Amino acid sequence: MKHSYFISDLHLSETQPELTALFVDFMQNLAPQAERLYILGDLFDFWIGDDEQSTLIQQVKDLIKSVSNQGVQCYFQHGNRDFLIGERFSKETGAQLLPDYQLITLYDKKILLCHGDTLCIDDVAYQQFRRRVHQKWLQRLFLCLPLKVRLKIAEKIRAKSNQDKQAKSQEIMDINQAFTTEKVQEFGVNLLIHGHTHREAIHQQEGFTRIVLGDWRKNYASILKMDESGEFGFIKD
């Protein structure tokens, strides 16, 4: 039966080879069987520019390109960790870049896709930070810096983010229900798929279904499968 996959929040890095191994297994064995593959952000733990080269980055690019070459339509939506992924990455992998909110029609279902961080409006400090770093002039300036400088800045930002999380409540870091409902109504859908919060679940809410993609952890890959009959669910080992 025809089907598609949705994943997010892998946070791939050279310090966690077990996550890379899970991704390799998925891309070699499951992904080629799909019609479409949607990666909804935070594929990498951080991204400092399309010009960065590493064994991991090249391996991931090659895997996506291979799946794309096998006829799978691949899509990538930016996360809060890899929002600087650009057109060069898209060309080298064959993955189409999507905007922050993307309306799709899949197997006769209208679906709204987003990474999920834009729905967490109660985290005021993060939203202010997000607005700053998404300014195009600031991104252009950052990308002009030497790679070593960009790496140091990214490491400092990541460390501060991890520190800030310790002081924030789980409620603040979750989506705002009223705002999320407004977005769903704005796009006229009854199905929303997002990641970011790392709280894998399928929520039946008033008027729509909200699917939250989980993060990938040692020995567990959060993979949502939707088939042409409209059925969907997380793949369980």
From Swiss-Prot:
Note on cofactor: Binds 2 Mn(2+) ions per subunit in a binuclear metal center.
Recorded hits in CDD domains, A to Z, give: MPP_YbbF-LpxH
What does this protein need as cofactor? Mn(2+)
* NCBIfam families noted in UniProt: lipid_A_lpxH (TIGR01854), PRK05340.1 (NF003743)
Q: Has UniProt tagged this entry with the keyword Transport?
A: no
Name the lineage: Bacteria, Pseudomonadati, Pseudomonadota, Gammaproteobacteria, Pasteurellales
Protein name per UniProt: UDP-2,3-diacylglucosamine hydrolase
- What family does the Swiss-Prot or TrEMBL record give for this protein? Belongs to the LpxH family.
- Pfam families reported in the protein's UniProt record: Metallophos
Cellular location(s):
Cell inner membrane
Primary localization class, coarse:
membrane
* Binding site residues for Mn(2+) 1: D9, H11, D42, H198
Q: Which positions bind substrate?
A: N80, R81, D123, S161, K165, K168, H196
One GO BP annotation is: lipid A biosynthetic process
**Any idea of its EC number?**
3.6.1.54
Q: Which SUPFAM superfamilies match?
A: Metallo-dependent phosphatases
- What keywords would UniProt list here? Cell inner membrane, Cell membrane, Hydrolase, Lipid A biosynthesis, Lipid biosynthesis, Lipid metabolism, Manganese, Membrane, Metal-binding
| GO cellular component entries | cytoplasm; extrinsic component of plasma membrane
- Entries under PANTHER family matching the protein: UDP-2,3-DIACYLGLUCOSAMINE HYDROLASE, UDP-2,3-DIACYLGLUCOSAMINE HYDROLASE-RELATED
Name the chemical reaction catalysed here: UDP-2-N,3-O-bis[(3R)-3-hydroxytetradecanoyl]-alpha-D-glucosamine + H2O = 2-N,3-O-bis[(3R)-3-hydroxytetradecanoyl]-alpha-D-glucosaminyl 1-phosphate + UMP + 2 H(+)
Topology relative to the membrane: Peripheral membrane protein
Native species: Haemophilus influenzae (strain PittGG)
Originating gene: lpxH
Q: What role is this protein assigned? A: Hydrolyzes the pyrophosphate bond of UDP-2,3-diacylglucosamine to yield 2,3-diacylglucosamine 1-phosphate (lipid X) and UMP by catalyzing the attack of water at the alpha-P atom. Involved in the biosynthesis of lipid A, a phosphorylated glycolipid that anchors the lipopolysaccharide to the outer membrane of the cell.
GO MF term list? manganese ion binding; UDP-2,3-diacylglucosamine hydrolase activity
